[in-house]
Every structure is written in structure tokens, then in C-alpha cells.
Amino acid sequence: AVAGGRAIVASRGKGQRRIENAVISVGSGSLSVEALCDSGNTLTDVASGLPVVIVSENLAQKLRSADGVRIEGFVEAATVGGQFSLPIVGLDGVTVCGRTVKAYAALSERTFDGYEAILQNTMFDGGRGGRGLSAKR
């Protein structure tokens, strides 16, 4: 189990962003990453109801090379930049803020600035949860 963790609040533009240390478990291994706590990420898998974490291109490559990882479906997401479809893979768990949840990872082809994953809003304290976009299989 992962205890503690650190939170970073970084100024960027007009607002602030909260970065937490997260541990992503998949297969027989785990990866420690910096993750953005995004109250706007409401992505969930429609079949299971599990949260969907969006991961950077670099982290996506690491996950794709893990034993037993395969594309299990796609998530449709809409942002200011447009609508897009991302492949998803199953994770054994994501630990953040002292809590572990089973989740999916949406594999992005983008590099993120200062973090490697974007957490779904129910995964961290302060997240509101609620309805959102769904992953299709």
C-alpha cells in the first residue's frame, strides 16, 4: 500500500492546478507518476462504471509494453479542441490520496506539461464525481 503522497499546486495562467503522486498498477509491476487532479474529467467506462484516467504518450508507451495489457475498447471525449477517440486498457489499480481504485487508462498521443496522467474526478479528495462521458466497447 502507498501511504502519504505529496500534492503540488502550480500556478498556470489564470488558475491553479493540483498535481498528486499516483501509483498505477498493471500486470506484475507499478509505475509512480505525477497526476493532474482534474475536476472536469468525468470519463467512465460504460460497461463497468469504472473511472478512466487519461495518460500521456510516454506513459501510454510504458503501459502498452506491460505483460498482459491489451486494448479493451475506446473512449469518446470532447474538449475545447474538438472530439476524439482514445483506446483504453485495463489497470489493476490507481493509488492516489491513500486510496486505490480499479480503473481504465485512455492512451493519449500527447505530451502533458508537468504530469503524466489526468485523474478522473472521483479518484481524488475534492472530486465531485457525477455523470460524464462514457467509454465504448
Describe the function of each predicted region.
Residues 14-15, 39-62, 66, 73-83:
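Cytosolic, positively charged, low-complexity intrinsically disordered regions immediately flanking transmembrane
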Residues 1-46, 51-53:
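Canonical alpha-helical transmembrane segment with a positive-inside/aromatic-interface signature
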Residues 136-137:
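Long, low-complexity, charge-dense
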